[in-house]
Every structure is written in structure tokens, then in C-alpha cells.
Amino acid sequence: MLGKGVVDYTREGSILSAEQRRFYEKNGYLLIRNCVPQYELNRFRQRFQDICEKKVKAPENMTVMKDISIAKSEFKDGEKAITKIQDFADDPVLFEYCKYPGVVDVVKDLIGNPKSNLMAMHTMLINKPPDNGKLTSRHPMHQDLQYFPFRPADFICCAWTAMEKITRANGCLVVVPGTHKGVLLPHEYPKWEGGVNKAYHGIQDYDTSTPRIHVEMEPGDTVFFHPILIHGSGANRTEGFRKAISCHYANDDLCRYVNVEGTTQETLAEEIIEIAKKRLTRYGLDPNTVTLDFADIWRVRAREVNGRRSNL
């Protein structure tokens, strides 16, 4: 059972009912309707626009990404040119999402208790662009643990909030219930004709006929899911952009960094380390003289949500 000895999924939590906790334990995800109010979403949307239009200075460690199709399209500047921002934990407005009580209290019920110290490990605001026919806006089926050098997986949880109506048409999340009880599978870049965005790894030889659930959402709805749950998202076949905001949390009382050398994560870790080294030039450092390991990168990213940082 998930969280054995720490979380009792047969009992109600501070926020969640026993039925909701059992659903998460069985399926690896839980959808909470109206979790984040519209006025908060409006603030996050405005902040994203201000960052894209350079009306406010983005934190130095924030990553601003373009879809490979956008990089070659008519969208050169502003909100329509950006497909995602990552590592927004040092932005005072966007980080309020990670600390929003309606989200944090659910996470604590799933991977800890009311006194648990949580860390925000990975943050994203996704602006999925309209697909130009090459299907580059889709995300291959994957497991988030592929990217994380910390364990145990049962004490990591993603909160993913819709900032607008999200449907199959504009590329909602798809999940394969129960797969969180399996293991981390080997990942690689999909061999897609239209190309694949940087670090968009997918499960090797994945059977696309496997039944899946499409998680359609209204603004403010939030899906919480386990890092081994197999999931992905479809292409955005509408003319508009599709926004969502997310944070991966880890229970800092229980999680520790692990060495991924010699595992299925090693290749991706090397790729991310190389990306990080290239960014060191921003600070006047020679990347060839700096030694980094995968855990170092995550230590820099991680931020306290509550309590005092201890292990991560």
C-alpha cells in the first residue's frame, strides 16, 4: 500500500474523505473540482503575460521555453511565443500557487499529514500552443519519476491545475489508472516525424492501444497524481492556447536524493546536466571547469513550501 506506516488511506484526512484517499491509493490520481478560485488564476495568467512581454523581470533561474514548431513560426514575441515556463519558484506571484492552502492541504493528505514539511521541487506554467499539423504540442506517455533523483516515490505528488477549460480538443491530460503501482520504465525520445521538444521523453515501446482516461477539466479544477503514474497529453487541435499551472511536491521529512547512475534515468540526467552547464555562462562561469551531479540541479530548484528545509 502507498505510504505504508505514514499515510492511512482507509481513513479520512484533514481535507479528503476516506473514499477520495482510497481512490488515489488505487488509481494513482485524484481530481478535485474548483480547487483554485478564478481570481487566483487571473493573477497567475496576468503574471505569465507580464513575464512573456518582459514587463517584469523573470528570475534568473527560470526557464522560458518555445515549442519547436513555434520557434519557426510567426509567433516571435509575447505570450504566443512561449509554450512553457519552468522553475518559477523564485517569482513571488507564481509561487503563491505552490503555497495555496487548497492545494497544499490536499497534497499533505496524500503524501503526509498536516505537520509534514513540503518542498516544491518542480514548477511549470504550460501554455500549450495550437498544433500546426506536426503534432509537436502533444506530450508522449511518460512517468514523471524519470526526471527526479529523489525517493520514495510514494511521497512525491504533482498538483496540476487547469487555468481554463481543458478538453480532448485542446489536449487534456490522459492517465492510465493503477500504473503507479508498477515500476519506472525505460524512457527515450519518441521517433515522431514532426520532431519532439527538448526533454519530452516517453516510455520505450509504449503500447498506444492501452486504455486511458481523458481528464477534462474546468478552470480551477486540479488533478493530483503519483510520479509513477503513466500519463501524457494530446495535441492542441484548437486555435487557442491551453494553460495549466503545476507543482511537484515532495515530503521533505521522508524523501532523500539518490544516485541515478547505472539506472534507466542516467541518460536523461546527463542531458539535463549538460543543459545546466550551458546556463552557467550567464554567470560568467566556464562550464568545463564545473562539476555537477543530477541532485545538485534539484537542490537549486527546490523551495520550502512550509516548515524548515532539511533533506532536499
UniProtKB/Swiss-Prot annotation:
UniProt cross-references to InterPro entries, sorted A to Z: PhyH, Phytyl_CoA_dOase-like
Q: Which GO terms describe its molecular function?
A: L-ascorbic acid binding; metal ion binding; phytanoyl-CoA dioxygenase activity
Its EC number is 1.14.11.18
Where Fe cation is bound, by residue?
H142, D144, H231
Report whether Nucleotide-binding shows up as a keyword of the record.
no
According to UniProt, this protein's pathway is: Lipid metabolism; fatty acid metabolism
Required co-factors: Fe cation; L-ascorbate
Q: What is the enzyme's main class?
A: oxidoreductase
The record's listing under PANTHER family reads: PHYTANOYL-COA ALPHA-HYDROXYLASE, PHYTANOYL-COA DIOXYGENASE, PEROXISOMAL
The protein's name is Probable phytanoyl-CoA dioxygenase
- Organism, as annotated: Caenorhabditis elegans
